[in-house]
Amino acid sequence: MTPVVALVGRPNVGKSTLFNRLTRTRDALVADFPGLTRDRKYGQAKLGELEFIVVDTGGIDGTEEGIELKMAEQSLLAIEEADVVLFMVDARAGLTAADQAIAAHLRKTHKKVFLVANKTDGIDGDSAVSEFYCLALGDVYQIAAAHGRGVLSLLELALAPHLETLVDAAAEEDAQDEEEEDFDEEALLRMVAAGDLDTREDTKETPFADLPIKFAIVGRPNVGKSTLTNRMLGEDRVIVYDMPGTTRDSVYVPMERDEQKYVVIDTAGVRRRGKVHETVEKFSVIKTLKAIEDANVCLLVIDAQETITDQDLSILGFVLHSGRSVVLVVNKWDGLDQKVKEDVKNELDRRLGFIDFARVHFISALHGSGVGHLFESIQEAYQSATRRTSTAMLTRIMQMAQEDHQPPMVNGRRVKLKYAHAGGYNPPRIVIHGNQLNDLPDSYKRYLINYFRKSLKIMGSPIRVEFQESANPFEGRKNTMTLSQERQRKRLLKAKTKK
């Protein structure tokens, strides 16, 4: 599960500065969802190989009233869902009543809290932070978010348990890779040259073929996620949701259909049947992002009556960036007249044309029309994302792509694609080796991706294609002349001098 780090503190202590520093290596995902805290931001960050989600909860000073109190409550809800809380204070401004009010709340949450004193550059940090020890939150960690001083060591300490888990998972993955079939590059190139590629065994069984398919139902508030969840589980199924101890994660509900096991990840909380018609759905962006990271397939639910919004595109962008398979679900399709339906389809083609590989279903979660076909697309997307393809098959497909459309010329020389092999799955990752691949235009890269998708019949899953430049065996070597060549060179130079 992707860890979540929440930045908490009163206004103007440097939370946004630290947020921007943590997310600078990745494009920050900014989501302004109605009903959530104003100016609340969510971003992806990376520490080594560990990816985590950063939440800027907005300023809290403990004295909010009215609508400000409601916004503060939403920020405190984000704290409850976080794995690590960085409580930021201003070392230059000193301890304030707002700091004490926030600290009192954090002590009650029993969360893993790190007290972070920002803006310690240019002052005596030890003296400035001494008064913050009275907050009873343990050690005070000094940083300068604007310059990055102390940030790395703070993250390594705060995320240490998750880093250890990542190392253990990487070791297991390396052990699995060692068991996989290795191939001899030179032998493969000889087979390519001779046209002797055996593509009969083009796929292999995945090591988790018997595991349940995890799919997450994601989308904006009030698009019918919980209604769809209960419809897929069965209306008579009574599910207790958000029990104590489960608020940090989405609700995982196992189910089985046609002898296929599934795990439904509901980001809105699975309701009892009698509560399906509540007008206000419980919604959390953090739950959605974590569910996307943990799922195999994501069902993005769109309201047909509101068409596509920027929030839908933000969630879809996170799904694709995470490499997850996607199925588009247009809900509330019943009751629309034919002209409105045509307008909705045209809008989908216009704004979502870049994911033409995803299945689109027009359903009514309330009445159940079209819901049963979702399972077919879920299985199709999952199988596309996890199916393994042999090196011989991928290389042959690459050759056919070159035969249909040759790579362009670069500096008078043709870009040469030598061979391709699988570099991973879920999503499928294809590694292509060759010469001058760094100069290959993006248009030809997209052509190769589409050719692989069509040839392998991959639906619902993105494809990652990586290009690795083959090493030049003569790079850095200086040609040496033989004795006869040296003598000939001297004769030519001597003859040229006489002229």
Curated annotation (Swiss-Prot):
GTP 2 binds at residues 219-226, 266-270, 331-334. Keywords: GTP-binding, Nucleotide-binding, Repeat, Ribosome biogenesis. Signal peptide: none annotated. GTP 1 binds at residues 9-16, 56-60, 118-121. GO terms for molecular function: GTP binding; ribosome binding. Residues 3-166, 213-386 form the EngA-type G domain. The keyword Nucleotide-binding applies. Residues 488-499 have a biased composition (Basic residues). GO terms for biological process: ribosome biogenesis. CDD domains: EngA1, EngA2. Residues 387-471 form the KH-like domain. Residues 476-499 are annotated as: Disordered. The keyword Membrane does not apply. Associates with the 50S ribosomal subunit. GTPase that plays an essential role in the late steps of ribosome biogenesis. Belongs to the TRAFAC class TrmE-Era-EngA-EngB-Septin-like GTPase superfamily. EngA (Der) GTPase family. This is GTPase Der.
